[in-house]
């Protein structure tokens, strides 16, 4: 297959996905193209539509030209897109937002225009409609609502960075890394910007609604916060001056949020419930499971930890508090997982009462094991520090983690709660003590 069109989609089946796909089928020579739709977190009629679309492709004789991917959890733009790229077979990968609609044109014109720069420029790796500046990155980038990327770019620099969550910034980073690897990012048509610099016109037959998913408050309630946090991530990597300017007035004392939760502040910073000493933390990697709003992680920052991985299961607390609280500090990495005995599952986390244990109602969150957490983050050190405060899941995490993995931690801080495991054998704290000493 020469071209693969990858479309990530999150709900909005009738108003976005359907018209997007209808236009592709109408104005594209499908004999040269495969369509890959990566559905994630959809609770509308997307599944039924994809089933009917498969039947349509079968009837047209293009059964092998449609691939669909389904994930119950909302993965975010980068991850959902990467899932599509992984199964795509084309030499050229077209990334297309579901809120972009082809306009009337000669069949296949849009493909030819995107492919044009590849034919005249051997260094071209990415073609796009819009290339503009990113202030946080201090670099130009292609806006990924529609781009064509040669497979050799992915082969050399990898897929989109999934650290940007919902989205915003992954396209900038990908373009920067592609250029550093020797590729060029090329606009496929000339454009003319409006006087205010917000709109442009050009000779390309497409209409882009513009962030139709992330601007839906029912799907992404805090897009402004997410975009700012992702901008800081970019600046940390590529434009230190922007990062330092934006975060210069955010010292740790301000970030402790005493008025938000004075109990947690006092517990960690003044009472020092865990009995933490600087010498135990300094220059070590800390795994903070049950980070809540980030107070323990910030204490570790003050004690000069090398890196702190702040893991919080509750999506609301993670988005609204933890990420913002640790934002200015490069040594604190916030992660939204439910650490458990298994990984790769999706569980529901209750957003109430400050609890972070796995429950039967609430937001869907992906599970991860302690071992996989270390592997995924390339943590190879053996003098690690572990902190556990996860409302009863501490027992499951420790008892179902291999002993050789546990022994990589020199120090374990743990707040014990009632064990949620129904097996009475696993409810005895002495069993934990025996296990750790084994």
Question: Predicted segments — roles?
Answer:
Residues 22-32:
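Short, acidic, metal-binding catalytic loop of nucleotide-sugar glycosyltransferases
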Residues 32-42, 67-71:
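Short beta-strand/loop segment that forms part of the nucleotide-sugar
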Residues 39-49, 341:
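A conserved acidic beta->alpha catalytic loop
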Residues 70-88, 140-141:
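Glycine-rich, basic loop-to-helix element that forms the pyrophosphate-binding segment
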Residues 93:
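Short aromatic/hydrophobic "clamp" motif used to bind/position activated sugar donors
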Residues 101-139:
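Conserved donor NDP-sugar-binding/catalytic core segment of glycosyltransferases
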Residues 166-247:
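C-terminal catalytic/acceptor-binding lobe
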Residues 242-438:
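Phosphate/nucleotide-binding beta-alpha loop and adjacent structural elements of enzyme active sites
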């Amino acid at each position: 297959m020469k071209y693969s069109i990858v479309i990530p989609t999150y709900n909005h089946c009738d108003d976005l996905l359907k018209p997007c796909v209808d236009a592709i089928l109408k104005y594209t020579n499908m004999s040269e193209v495969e369509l890959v739709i990566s559905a994630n977190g959809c609770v509308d009629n997307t599944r039924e539509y994809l089933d009917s679309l498969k039947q349509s492709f079968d009837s047209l004789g293009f059964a092998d030209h449609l691939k669909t991917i389904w994930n119950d959890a909302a993965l975010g733009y980068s991850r959902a897109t990467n899932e599509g790229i992984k199964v795509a077979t084309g030499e050229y990968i077209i990334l297309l937002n579901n809120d972009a609609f082809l306009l009337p044109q000669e069949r296949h014109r849009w493909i030819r225009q995107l492919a044009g720069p590849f034919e005249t420029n051997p260094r071209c790796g990415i073609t796009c409609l819009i290339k503009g500046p990113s202030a946080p990155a201090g670099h130009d980038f292609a806006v990924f609502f529609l781009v064509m990327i040669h497979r050799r770019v992915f082969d050399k620099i990898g897929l989109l960075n999934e650290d940007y969550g919902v989205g915003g910034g992954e396209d900038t980073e990908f373009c920067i890394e592609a250029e550093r690897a020797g590729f060029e990012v090329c606009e496929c048509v000339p454009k003319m910007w409006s006087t205010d610099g917000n709109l442009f016109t050009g000779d390309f037959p497409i209409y882009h609604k513009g962030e139709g998913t992330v601007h839906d408050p029912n799907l992404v309630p805090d897009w402004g916060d997410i975009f700012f946090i992702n901008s800081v991530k970019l600046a940390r990597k590529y434009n230190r001056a922007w990062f330092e300017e934006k975060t210069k007035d955010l010292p740790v004392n301000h970030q402790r949020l005493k008025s938000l939760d004075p109990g947690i502040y006092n517990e960690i910073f003044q009472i020092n419930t865990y009995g933490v000493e600087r010498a135990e933390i300094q220059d070590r990697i800390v795994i903070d499971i049950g980070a809540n709003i980030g107070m323990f992680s910030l204490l570790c920052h003050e004690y000069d930890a090398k890196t702190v991985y702040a893991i919080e299961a509750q999506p609301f607390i993670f988005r609204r508090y933890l990420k913002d609280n640790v934002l200015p500090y490069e040594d604190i990495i916030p992660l939204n997982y439910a650490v458990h005995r298994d990984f790769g599952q999706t569980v529901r986390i209750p957003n109430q009462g400050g609890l972070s244990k796995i429950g039967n109602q609430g937001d869907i969150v992906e599970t991860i094991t302690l071992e996989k957490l270390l592997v995924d983050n390339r943590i190879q050190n053996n003098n690690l520090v572990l902190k556990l405060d996860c409302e009863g899941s501490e027992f499951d995490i420790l008892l179902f983690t291999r002993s050789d993995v546990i022994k990589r931690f020199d120090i374990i801080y743990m707040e014990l709660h009632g064990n949620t495991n129904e097996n009475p054998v696993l409810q005895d704290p002495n069993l934990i003590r025996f296990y750790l000493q084994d």
